[in-house]
Amino acid sequence: MPAFRLPVRQLVEFLLRTGSIDSRFTGFDRANEGARIHRKLQKAAGEGYAAEVFLSGEREAAGIPFTIEGRADGIFTDEAGVTVIDEIKTTAVPADDIAEDMNPCHWAQGMVYGAICAQQRELETLDVRLTYYQIDTDEIIRYTRHFSAAELDAFLNDLLRQYLPWARRQLDWVEARDRSLGALQFPFPAYRPGQRALAG
């Protein structure tokens, strides 16, 4: 069975996102503005800060192989020698209202990247840092949490267990589609020159 490919953000938001009419984290022009601010903060972080780090990890849940992947905003090693996953978020929420537990998806995203990074680098511990950039005042608010690799691993495995019903549905649909396509007959008595090669 081929691996079920799952972007980190999709996994986290599918399971943990809650409804809200608060659009201060998203918006029409926010994506471009957010990307510009990400680059600004990443550049200011200095030497030793790796920006936009692609991470991909293999996991299995109930016999289904998963490939979980995405780009961590930043990874660096702090003064104490601890690897830190930096998750950057731009927001219009007033700085006084930017709380550590404001959005569980933000921590979850960093923790999933942390689980993959810890596995790849064989780390026993790792920090996840949320960097909030307030777009109206240019204020930067940071929160950091320390995790063991075992905690991060258990967190990711739990998310995958929760996601299993949807993964199974999608895999069943793909299997049914492929069976149906395999049973289709070519609607004409013969292929035209080159048509068979094009059809595969």
List where the protein language model places each region.
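Short, compositionally biased low-complexity segments
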Residues: 2-20, 125-132, 168-178
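Conserved aromatic-histidine-acidic binding/catalytic patches
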Residues: 25, 29, 98-105, 190
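Mg2+/Mn2+-dependent nuclease catalytic core
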Residues: 58-153
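Polybasic (Lys/Arg-rich)
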Residues: 150-182
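Conserved pre-motif I regulatory segment
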Residues: 172-200
